[in-house]
Amino acid sequence: AISRSNEAKALGIPMGAPAFKYEKIFRENDVQVFSSNFPLYGDMSSRVMSILSKFTPNIEIYSIDEAFLKFEGFENYDLESYCEEIKDKVLKWTGIPVSIGIAPTKALAKIANRIAKKFPNQTKGVYSINSDEKRIKALKWLNTGDVWGIGFRHAKRLKNIKVNTAYNFINLEDGWVRKNMSVVGLRLKKELEGKSVLDLEEVRSPKKAIATTRSFEGTITDYEKIKERISTFSICCAEKLRAQSSNCNSIYIFVRSNKFQKNKKQYRNGILMTIPFSTNSNMVISKYAIEGLKKIFKKGINYKKAGAIVMGLDSSKNYQLNMFEKENPKHQILMKTLDFITKKEGTGKIKLGSQDLKRIWKMKQTKLSSRYTTELKEIIALK
């Protein structure tokens, strides 16, 4: 499970749980299970973000289902009523319920949002931390591990020194926080104290790493089949690099067996391959990915998952050159042509020799819901 409703959480179904382990609970409680439907999610996310942008010009799209809105110049507005209007509009126009948290800082807004979501009957989906009293009450309520920006490692360290709530955290000395959690942790502390230090990122920064990973429909033992997938994953990363005008100078390849098949031999390994020059070429990135696979592939293993992650990203318009090795300049022209054809004709029309020319690689989506808003043949029919 990568996403769960409140009802599913109440049944004790944890995040990341394999569906086959909970089939009995599914049957007994009429739990509906759906495969990932990224075209639908992406389209609905765009619609929600478009609606939000009509209520303020200052918006940071934080993830596919989260955004920060800045209400600068709204001093004369009743923000709680205004946000109720936003919530109602999103629900009416998209059918998607949202929760809204209002606060003077991003970190406190995340906590307010958590309260709005946790107590829908009391908050009606909107909660404002608009006083010091409410801020302190919220911080005493929230566990340290649930604070936005405090990861598992820091949460464990804080718990060891009896820092169990966000309120305990803000009472730590600034020097200790900076020393043990860096300047990032100190900024978070200031945010929880009500001092805004994290600006809105209205222009999304390019990603610092790009990954393409997949679990296979079954298990695979054949090297050539794994190679085809690694080649395809690395090329997908290269396409994403070009989409954000970036190059990479290294690629990490990994393979792993099925951890749920305890009776089978277990194996997992990965390798970082350094590319001697910055590139976003399908041919170069795929070549180094396959070289990496050769080093870590082991015969006799039932492989269930593999992936490629490109790292060392920089701008393709301004990058460091290597005095001794450089990319074939024809690759840039070829990639532009390839991207043009892909945009016009669709993905998979032109492939490298290391890819299966007949195979269209798809995720396992046996319980896929309809793509109502992006596929004409799947649109809702009214009778």
Regions found by a protein language model. Name each.
Residues I275-K383:
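Acidic, metal-coordinating catalytic segment for phosphate/diphosphate chemistry
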Residues Y62-E66, A103-K106, S246-S250, I301-K305, ...:
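Short Gly/Ser/Thr- and Asp/Glu-enriched loop/turn motifs at secondary-structure junctions
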Residues L79-N143:
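Long, highly charged, low-complexity intrinsically disordered interaction regions
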